[in-house]
From Swiss-Prot:
Homology family: Belongs to the HHV-5 IE2 protein family.
Notes on the domains: The SUMO-interacting motif (SIM) is required for efficient transactivation function.
Source organism of this protein record: Human cytomegalovirus (strain AD169)
Matches recorded under Pfam families: Herpes_IE1 (PF07340), Herpes_IE2_3 (PF03361)
Covalent cross-link site, Glycyl lysine isopeptide (Lys-Gly) (interchain with G-Cter in SUMO): 175, 180
Annotated motif SUMO-interacting motif 1/SIM1, positions: 199-202
One MF term in the entry's GO annotations: DNA binding
PTM: Phosphorylated by host CK2 at Ser-203 and Ser-205; leading to enhanced SUMOylation. SUMOylated; SUMOylation is enhanced when IE2 is phosphorylated by host CK2. The sumoylation is necessary for efficient replication of the virus and thus for the function of this viral transcription factor.
Protein name, UniProt field: Viral transcription factor IE2
Amino acid sequence: MESSAKRKMDPDNPDEGPSSKVPRPETPVTKATTFLQTMLRKEVNSQLSLGDPLFPELAEESLKTFEQVTEDCNENPEKDVLAELGDILAQAVNHAGIDSSSTGPTLTTHSCSVSSAPLNKPTPTSVAVTNTPLPGASATPELSPRKKPRKTTRPFKVIIKPPVPPAPIMLPLIKQEDIKPEPDFTIQYRNKIIDTAGCIVISDSEEEQGEEVETRGATASSPSTGSGTPRVTSPTHPLSQMNHPPLPDPLGRPDEDSSSSSSSSCSSASDSESESEEMKCSSGGGASVTSSHHGRGGFGGAASSSLLSCGHQSSGGASTGPRKKKSKRISELDNEKVRNIMKDKNTPFCTPNVQTRRGRVKIDEVSRMFRNTNRSLEYKNLPFTIPSMHQVLDEAIKACKTMQVNNKGIQIIYTRNHEVKSEVDAVRCRLGTMCNLALSTPFLMEHTMPVTHPPEVAQRTADACNEGVKAAWSLKELHTHQLCPRSSDYRNMIIHAATPVDLLGALNLCLPLMQKFPKQVMVRIFSTNQGGFMLPIYETAAKAYAVGQFEQPTETPPEDLDTLSLAIEAAIQDLRNKSQ
């Protein structure tokens, strides 16, 4: 059935006016949609009226159920639609603006039910729709008109439910009187129980000196405070009855049996320097200092609070805390300077009134050079006379002729130039692969204030040296100063060899540095007393070198065949002579 070119105005649906567009041909689905919308509109109008004179009253006889409409097919102009309504009804419901898949589970009173089962007694309102706005039309893939309709002869039932917001979760009301603090967490102070979550006790009076404050810690669910009391005890817990190993007390407190001496003085806190830095307690006053110590809980992992009470007590009992193990971290090179050690010992430094400026410092400006500063004396080139390579090599050869070089060594001094340092590090790597060598780590030199001794001091020293050892030992010439020592920025390294072979081998690696950087690198030979080697493991190699020069080689070269044959003939001739 095709409609005309212009669609006429529908009196039941005034929102749709005449359109000049050519409408699409009506399908059974669109016809069923129009039929359902008409039925729903009447029902909505009947519910909205509710005796209101602004809405027209509808007689109950004009309202018919879906079953009555299907039976009265002759009066219904859409009887051709009702004949195959069983297959199209679900699609018409979607086109009518109702999507059953998007609706949530709601009560039955808020649903629209359409059933083909016969009713015993017709009711005036068999279709109930609330005034909830209907969702937009949607077509799911299962209800698409392109799919083949399902064949069924059974009576069907379609339940259409409008969307409603999800029901909130009802929680039981909790009265304020029912909220009580946990009974496991209590604080006892002066034989009184205080129902609070935590307590900070600061005593300044002599009457409260030596009194005991106990805090019974709660389980993991109880809140932890920033401060605590001298004793923290956990309540009875089912897990605490298990045979667990005793946990160490982080504060070193005694057990509950010996709680009489829990409040002790800090007179024995000097056993550990690290502990004395953290707790500074006065011996004359009776003040107790509170400090927070957070630890791990026994089973729940909750942080426990404790209070450290420090004060003088007449009983004399004292409980020492645990000694904290000092760190074995290797200090930096700057922390090992003499200047830093003197500052740690509170050595006073004189602060000269000089003008600090960049540039070279004259020799007579001693106070400016040794002012109290952390900067080093910087040198682009080495500030002393550098010997030549021939002098260094000649000194090494003289030492090697004696066959013992345990009193000789090689000293390398170089500036902190990046290029120089890279070359020196490469030589250090090669020296590390050689045998019988003792290498030092590059170190700095610190310098003190220069002073010129008067002639009488020089005379006393010379006389003591001429008299002998006893006079030199008794000589006390200590001249001190109050200026700050300064370190130079050039590095020093010492190489000690066990045999002349190793001394010359190390020197052959170091002399090219001196040749490449004549003003930044210096190599020289120094002498020591007969103190031996850096380790006694090199003594065997040194003795073997000295003995090896006087021993004959163990392997003799093989004799020629001619010489061997002549020897055999000579031996035969000797035997003949003896036989005669």
